[in-house]
Amino acid sequence: MPGLAAEGEAEGWSPSPPLYEEYRPPPLDSIRLPRYVLYLLLAALVVVAVAYAIVGHLIKDLAHDLADWAFGPKPDQEAAPRELRPSLTGEDLEGLDLQLALAWQGEEDAGGGGEGAPSEPPPPPEPRRPSIAFKDPPSRSSFWKLMAT
């Protein structure tokens, strides 16, 4: 067996000097960055992408509003319906509901009968009532009356 080991070593050995004694492979990355910098850049990219996905429509609306402010609205947007007020605080919402229903009923009457205005004025709105109904205060039942005597 010692002869076989000597033959295997002899195959890899050569009397000439090695060709690539000081060979260094080229770097795989064109930009040398530490790993933590690369991870920080990727994390920042993910955060920006998620933030844009969340508020992208808001940014788009803001850009359209700025363009409308700077250049004026498009000609086809002149007849567009106006937006509602952002807050209805202090408004009687039940009264507004009644007015809307009466206006809608008036449009149906005007469309069907051909009249311009309804024949009778709308009834006055009912007085406001609380939307929560409370029961009468509890009274002593007959069971307690029997127990007291």
Curated annotation (Swiss-Prot):
What's the domain of life for this entry?
Answer: Eukaryota
> Its GO CC terms?
membrane
Which residue ranges traverse the bilayer? 36-56
Q: Where is this region: Disordered?
A: 104-149
**Where is the protein situated, by its record's location annotation?**
Membrane
- Protein topology in the membrane: Single-pass membrane protein
- Name the UniProt key words of this record, in alphabetical order: Membrane, Transmembrane, Transmembrane helix
Q: What is this protein called?
A: Small integral membrane protein 44
* Originating organism: Homo sapiens
Q: Which gene encodes it?
A: SMIM44
